[in-house]
């Protein structure tokens, strides 16, 4: 995506995605849900309006929905897709 993203926000979201992945791999859906809620809040409050914010928020909604159905494999796939939306850390 061509939007300039604040590096501190990208770092926070990336860390939260890692936390979500780890929680899912350990079967800790509660921690995963909390991390996804935080990602959505960070995106809403800190990312500039535009396609990237909308994409992140949509991904968070989908992750929350599949977690509500205890579909951890699907949630993990969404988290990994979300991580690919961010540039690699320098």
Describe the residue ranges of each PLM region:
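Acidic, polar-rich N-terminal leader regions of halophilic archaeal proteins
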Residues: 1-90
